[in-house]
């Protein structure tokens, strides 16, 4: 009966049904990822569910594309799922480079909260697909928005990896060992003598985590740069101006400056130890404000107007 009901819902409303299913997969994957900290065998289940989640999000977005007739990243609901798709893909790529159970532990809660927000918090009118306004009926929609969302995913992963470095090395003095190209990272001046309970996490390998954080942020920065360039070209094509200091544009530029400062610090080695890690970690909130905070104020060309809609 339950399976029959699921099939009916999947046929009637595949987008919402798959969205709920993705939420439950993440809900299952979270405790398994925590268990993997102490049991390496659980890591294979975490990767399996992460791959499944990534594929189901892709399938959901494909259904949305078919039903709406346009690329499924034109509203907040769609972009939230696209963001989680990007984060989960980045999680898998990072784990392939450095298979450490701490990586899904920091990524999955963000993915779960994002999907929960999309499923249960967003008003129904923001979940519905609608016809695009003339300015959005452009190939730049795919080129600009998808690149920006992938940049957010990469920057979030990089910031969370920096947070994990700080968490793992709590109360441990850190020293920056990276070269000007960012190869290397933090190392503890006094090696950590681990114990059997925490054995699956190699606490002396935070250098690799920091290196992956740097590389993720570098990828995100490059994508954000491309996003700003394509956005300016699209704006000129749609509205006749390259830059209008729209709140979203302004915060995207602030985010770009923020991470440019971080990369400058890493390349020049002007800062050492915890300070660049703290700087990168705080970047998570910069991205959060740029992506959600500005939009919800209901101001500018990029806004969704949710908060103002409630207040009115």
Swiss-Prot record:
RNA-binding listed as a keyword: no
Subcellular location(s): the record lists: Cellular thylakoid membrane
Q: Which keywords does this Swiss-Prot/TrEMBL entry list?
A: Cytochrome c-type biogenesis, Membrane, Thylakoid, Transmembrane, Transmembrane helix
Query: Where mainly found?
Result: membrane
List residues traversing the bilayer: 18-38, 48-68, 73-93, 102-122, 148-168, 216-236, 250-267, 279-299
What biological-process GO terms show up in the record? cytochrome complex assembly
- Cellular component GO terms, alphabetical: plasma membrane-derived thylakoid membrane
Kindly list any coiled-coil regions of this protein. none
Lipid bilayer topology: Multi-pass membrane protein
> What Gene Ontology terms describe what this protein does at the molecular function level?
heme binding
Q: Name one Pfam family in it.
A: Cytochrom_C_asm
PANTHER family reported for this sequence = CYTOCHROME B_B6 PROTEIN-RELATED (PTHR30071:SF1), HEME EXPORTER PROTEIN C (PTHR30071)
According to its UniProt entry, the function of this protein is described as: Required during biogenesis of c-type cytochromes (cytochrome c6 and cytochrome f) at the step of heme attachment.
Subunit annotation? May interact with ccs1.
UniProt similarity note: Belongs to the CcmF/CycK/Ccl1/NrfE/CcsA family.
Q: Which NCBIfam families match?
A: cytochr_II_ccsB (TIGR03144)
Please state what the protein is called: Cytochrome c biogenesis protein CcsA
The organism named in the record is Prochlorococcus marinus (strain MIT 9515)
């Amino acid at each position: 009966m339950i399976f029959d009901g699921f099939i009916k819902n999947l046929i009637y409303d595949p987008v919402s049904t798959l969205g709920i299913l993705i939420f439950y997969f993440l809900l299952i994957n979270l405790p398994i990822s925590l268990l993997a900290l102490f049991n390496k065998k659980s890591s294979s289940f975490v990767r399996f569910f992460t791959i499944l989640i990534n594929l189901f999000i892709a399938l959901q977005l494909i259904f949305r594309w078919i039903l709406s007739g346009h690329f499924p990243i034109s509203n907040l609901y769609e972009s939230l799922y696209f963001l989680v798709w990007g984060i989960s893909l980045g999680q898998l790529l990072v784990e392939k480079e450095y298979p450490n159970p701490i990586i899904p532990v920091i990524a999955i809660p963000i993915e779960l909260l994002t999907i929960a927000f999309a499923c249960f918090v967003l008003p129904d009118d923001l979940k519905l697909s609608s016809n695009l306004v003339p300015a959005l009926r452009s190939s730049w929609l795919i080129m600009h928005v998808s690149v920006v969302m992938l940049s957010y995913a990469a920057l979030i992963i990089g910031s969370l990896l920096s947070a994990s470095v700080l968490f793992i090395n709590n109360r441990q003095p850190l020293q920056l060992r990276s070269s000007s190209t960012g190869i290397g990272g933090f190392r503890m001046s006094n090696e950590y003598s681990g114990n059997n309970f925490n054995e699956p996490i190699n606490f002396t390998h935070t250098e690799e985590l920091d290196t992956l954080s740097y590389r993720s942020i570098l990828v995100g920065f490059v994508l954000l740069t491309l996003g700003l360039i394509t956005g300016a070209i699209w704006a000129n094509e749609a509205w006749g101006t390259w830059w209008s200091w729209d709140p979203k544009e302004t915060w995207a530029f602030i985010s770009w400056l923020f991470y440019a400062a971080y990369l400058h610090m890493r390349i020049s080695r002007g800062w050492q130890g915890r300070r660049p890690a703290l700087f990168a970690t705080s970047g998570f909130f910069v991205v959060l404000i740029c992506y959600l905070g500005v939009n919800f104020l209901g101001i500018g060309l990029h806004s969704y107007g949710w908060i103002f809609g409630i207040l009115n």
